[in-house]
């Protein structure tokens, strides 16, 4: 395997992250590898397992700096440390600006791009231009982590590189990384107890159907009858072929529940794993 570096044997100190309930720390290398495995698993759903895995390895490399370790061991008396820019810089040197964006923003959110003149602030260019020397030098990561120099990207990404497709891919990779990081952190600080599996769309649809049966069978008034008709149509419509649909219903027509009914029905019918609700604020 081509790699940016190879592990150099036993390190001179223990590099740590999250304080656990028993008073010990999670090894930083363990966290990096766990997040890489999870991010790769999540990204496999859209053909990016290798890319997700490498992004996970990159995400907390900045914690290998002396200041990063001081912060992990004594957060009450140590200033916050930017531990994300280091991994973003390595990703950029590999030509991987998808991962650079995801890593730079895995706590603060995806950054604006900025321009090469930025030498401060939160833009991606500013983060990539940041000088990481002295106590912020993270190069000790080379004693523990091996970063693949090359990974396979999804074929669909290379097929048509329009801006919307690239932006969506960056967001998907970012989401995989953030979920993986939070899940492994949660497991560590809860004493090794991983979060249980959530309900499947099929099970949620069963619960929804049980909840709305009385409304469908005996609507209380004319308005409720109209709402029930809309709801029933959405439940049936969810079984149509997989695709993009719109729902046009007047105010008071029960759009919230009916749209949920369609989404769960559609997900259950087509083996989809998640329902996302997007709300304008």
Language-model regions, residue ranges each:
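Hydrophobic helix-cap positions at the C-terminus of alpha-helices
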Residues: 42, 46, 237, 266-267
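Residue-level preference for the first positions of well-ordered beta-strands
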Residues: 51, 244-246, 274-276
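Walker A/P-loop
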Residues: 242-262
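Short, hydrophobic/aromatic alpha-helical segments in well-folded domains
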Residues: 38, 233, 262-263
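Conserved small/polar residues in nucleotide/adenosyl-binding loops
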Residues: 181, 279-281
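Conserved pre-motif I regulatory segment
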Residues: 215-244
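Accessory nucleic-acid engagement/destabilization modules that flank
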Residues: 3-211
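Conserved SF1/SF2 helicase motif Ia
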Residues: 265-279
């Amino acid at each position: 395997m081509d790699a940016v570096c190879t592990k150099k044997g036993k390190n001179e100190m223990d590099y740590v992250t999250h304080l656990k309930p028993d008073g010990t720390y999670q090894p930083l290398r363990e966290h990096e590898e766990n997040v890489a495995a999870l991010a790769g698993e999540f990204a496999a759903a859209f053909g990016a397992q290798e890319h997700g895995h490498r992004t996970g390895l990159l995400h907390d490399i900045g914690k290998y700096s002396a200041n990063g370790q001081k912060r992990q061991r004594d957060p009450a008396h140590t200033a916050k440390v930017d531990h994300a820019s280091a991994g973003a810089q390595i990703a950029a040197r590999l030509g991987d600006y998808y991962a650079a964006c995801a890593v730079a923003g895995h706590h603060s959110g995806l950054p604006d791009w900025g321009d090469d003149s930025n030498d401060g602030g939160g833009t991606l260019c500013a983060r990539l231009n940041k000088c990481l020397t002295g106590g912020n030098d993270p190069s000790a990561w080379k004693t523990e982590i091996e970063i693949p120099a090359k990974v396979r990207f999804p074929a669909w990404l290379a097929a048509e590189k329009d801006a919307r497709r690239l932006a969506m891919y960056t967001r998907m990779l970012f989401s995989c990384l953030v979920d993986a990081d939070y899940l492994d952190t949660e497991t560590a600080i809860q004493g090794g107890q991983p979060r249980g599996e959530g309900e499947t769309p099929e099970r949620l649809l069963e619960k929804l159907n049980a909840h709305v049966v009385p409304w469908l069978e005996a609507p209380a008034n004319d308005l409720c009858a109209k709402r029930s008709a809309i709801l029933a149509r959405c439940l049936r419509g969810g079984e149509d072929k997989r695709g993009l649909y719109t729902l046009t219903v007047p105010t008071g027509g029960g759009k919230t529940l009916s749209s949920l009914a369609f989404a769960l029905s559609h997900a259950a019918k087509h083996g989809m794993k998640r329902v996302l609700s997007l709300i304008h604020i």
